Amino acid sequence: MNPGYRGRFAPSPTGPLHFGSLVGALASWLDARAHGGTWLVRIEDLDGPRTVPGAADDILATLAHFGMTPDEPPIWQSTRDAAYTAALERLVAAGLVYPCGCTRKEIADSLRAAHERHTTLAYPGTCRTGLHGKPARAWRLRVPDGNDAVVTFDDRWQHAQSQNLATEVGDFVLKRADGQWAYQLAVVVDDADAGITHVVRGADLLDSTARQIYLQRCLGVPTPAYLHVPVVVDANGEKLSKQTGATALERDDPLPALRAAAAHLGLAADGDRPVHTIDAFYAAATDAWARRFGPRAG
């Protein structure tokens, strides 16, 4: 094992594991194994209304049937309120966040007006200077202006990336109006506390990465290496998800789905001859992954 490498797969328990999720799980698992590292599973169950009872246990059981068992006990976001609160308090003390009283309608109206004026569609910073008599609803992280707003990073699959937080995003929410923690804060705190060094996930989250890197800088925590794999889409070109009718994986015969997931990732996991066991598949797939993303040699 390489104690310096720590990766993770972070599903939301909104339903059973489907093929699109399998691609993400497989990519993160292969990267961890190719590097001789530790692979974790984090259950992202913060969104109470969307969480399906029993779905998390079903996801973990399906992963086990497919030969992917985490190296440490799963992490549950729903148990980590104190960690998120402590992070927000640090940002408040540093003057980096502010309460926001804007409703969704007010923000939508501002963005619509900006669109009509052909100006930025980012959150306009209405509450930066105060609530103006409105009750506090959410907490936002203040993003910098000018050149300091540009976050660049090199993605291991998607290559050079750049985003101007001021013009493309605006001050973003860390705690929502309904009291729930926002995805960006929870992910950054969880990755830091778990010592995650490598994040492998779907390209639908590529747009979130610059925000997470900026938040990591604000909290003074390390930035992992990022790799965003192509997402699986349905016949209409929509991301395959539970919301678009993705069906649960068949546990009885994992190999066909694993081969299809490897093919989606551009891996010739069978090599010159077909493999007939899960162990043989993973050995071949890990070698194929390492040839692209290293460093299994030795």
From Swiss-Prot:
Coiled coil: none annotated. It comes from the Bacteria. Zn(2+) binds at C100, C102, Y123, C127. The keyword Ligase applies. Binds 1 zinc ion per subunit. The keyword Aminoacyl-tRNA synthetase applies. Keywords: Aminoacyl-tRNA synthetase, ATP-binding, Ligase, Metal-binding, Nucleotide-binding, Zinc. A motif ('KMSKS' region) lies at residues 239-243. One of its GO terms (cellular component) is cytosol. Belongs to the class-I aminoacyl-tRNA synthetase family. GluQ subfamily. This is Glutamyl-Q tRNA(Asp) synthetase. It comes from Burkholderia cenocepacia (strain ATCC BAA-245 / DSM 16553 / LMG 16656 / NCTC 13227 / J2315 / CF5610) (Burkholderia cepacia (strain J2315)). The gene is gluQ.
